[in-house]
């Protein structure tokens, strides 16, 4: 039985995973520190180079020397001497006074005011300084990179082809959009011109549209003439439905035969009347007996054709399937109270559901906290097993630890 290298089980062994990880982390940390130090050194070198270049430019005269507010901290005792103090009788060091005079005497040579200094080649240095400034400008570097990228794109035929295709697609989309807008404008203009021809057909079309919207939005309740009740279309008087459908058909026939409105207006009126005819046909009417006999309908058609009554048409439009009577103030108040009660009930239901979910979440979090504690989960499982097990199970589990008799000692001790 070989246990392998026992040194690998020691905490100090260098080949264990933990020690290898520690070494790797220390190396990474050392490498990061080294990179940071190199970066700081590089920044210091660049800053020193900039300061030297600035100082050189100020010495040559290419750049105006800026007045720093903290120069007095770096000046010697001679820089803080005030000459007016001598006039006021205050003592001034003679050495400092001489130094200041020497500095003033040598100022002309430093600033280039000596005879013949105007012919000194100072322009080249200023040009070099300006060129170095332009090269180090970050905005100039960004512009240069952008120009290089543009040049690469222009020199690459594949990219140029893709760009041309994209431009062509965008132009085609714009042209299609313009064509659609032109067609829409033309259609609107045509519709306005046709609507100006027949004012009566326009009124009927608007009424039909409003009735269609009301019928689609909610189940229609229409008022039966002579009663104050509101009933559904399916429970309405079937004879009234049949008569209304016949009268609409007669009206359509008379309107189609009349030659007063223009051609396109009559087409639109027939198109708008068709959905009204479809709405008037309810399932109860389909299941009823067929229409009255043909002679009777022909008489009615003849009468309607000879003398059309506008009052009857207005009554039919008013009592069509989409018409509802105006509610009184009491009914409006009652509906408002019902809506408020419904909203209150919904708010209570929402709060109850939120509370229930909050209780469930709290119970889950509590169970998770109990399970996450060390030993609590096993303790709970032991309690559950103890509560469900019987006395026989406990005796069988402890059978090997029970005291044996003399008969059991005489038997083979290896057997169980």
Swiss-Prot record:
Biased composition (Low complexity): 251-263
Per UniProt, location of the Glycyl lysine isopeptide (Lys-Gly) (interchain with G-Cter in SUMO2) cross-link in this chain: 382
One GO biological process term: mRNA splicing, via spliceosome
Keyword line: Coiled coil, Isopeptide bond, mRNA processing, mRNA splicing, Nucleus, Phosphoprotein, Spliceosome, Ubl conjugation
Positions in coiled-coil regions: 20-70, 324-413
The organism's place on the tree of life at top rank: Eukaryota
SMART domains the UniProt entry points to: Cir_N
Composition bias type Basic residues, residue spans: 175-193, 277-300
Annotated InterPro entries: CIR_N_dom, CWC25, CWC25_splicing_factor
Compositionally skewed regions (Basic and acidic residues) per UniProt: 301-316, 327-343
Pfam families for the chain: Cir_N (PF10197), CWC25 (PF12542)
Cellular-component GO terms for this entry: nuclear speck; nucleus; U2-type catalytic step 1 spliceosome
Modified residues (Phosphoserine): 170, 222
Family: Belongs to the CWC25 family.
Record text on subunit structure and interactions: Identified in the spliceosome C complex.
UniProt protein name: Pre-mRNA-splicing factor CWC25 homolog
Lineage: Eukaryota, Metazoa, Chordata, Craniata, Vertebrata
